[in-house]
Amino acid sequence: MSNQMNTMDITEILKYLPHRYPFLLIDRVLDFTPGESLHAIKNVTINEPFFQGHFPIQPVMPGVLILEAMAQATGLLAFKTMSDDVPPPGVLYYFAGIDNARFRRVVEPGDQIHFEVKMIKERRGIGVFYGEAKVDGEVVCSAEIMCARREINQ
């Protein structure tokens, strides 16, 4: 087994995910093992557009966006499991379902969220994953996430 780290910077992430500002929520992949796991980060700053209304006096990252970022991490793992090549145009992984989502603490400006996702199974283009979001080593959110591979007409 190799000790080589598999990483992705933002330029590489943009080749795999269709999301763009303000909805691209993964900044970097620190490590991944295709078919097994992926570790990504999101740096949360006061400049995030959602903080204007959630909440101006006490800014808190919306939980649904933490889950969306986790789903983006699962999409990256799914793509890297499918092939090491950049996916062809029109191939996407859609957020297909969520189970057992739990929120344990708020995420605030200045936090760095670590997303650790593990592939549980994949069958016929449907992937099932378990993910945790952590800040300073403390779990802030956990969930089981499903994503579905689809080809869209362009």
From Swiss-Prot:
Catalytic reaction annotation: a (3R)-hydroxyacyl-[ACP] = a (2E)-enoyl-[ACP] + H2O
Catalytic site: H54
GO cellular component, one term: membrane
Assigned EC number: 4.2.1.59
InterPro entries, per database record: FabA_FabZ, FabZ, HotDog_dom_sf
Listed GO biological process terms: fatty acid biosynthetic process; lipid A biosynthetic process
One MF annotation (Gene Ontology) recorded for this entry: (3R)-hydroxyacyl-[acyl-carrier-protein] dehydratase activity
Family according to the record: Belongs to the thioester dehydratase family. FabZ subfamily.
Record function comment: Involved in unsaturated fatty acids biosynthesis. Catalyzes the dehydration of short chain beta-hydroxyacyl-ACPs and long chain saturated and unsaturated beta-hydroxyacyl-ACPs.
Stated name of the protein: 3-hydroxyacyl-[acyl-carrier-protein] dehydratase FabZ
UniProt source species: Shewanella oneidensis (strain ATCC 700550 / JCM 31522 / CIP 106686 / LMG 19005 / NCIMB 14063 / MR-1)
Gene that encodes the chain: fabZ
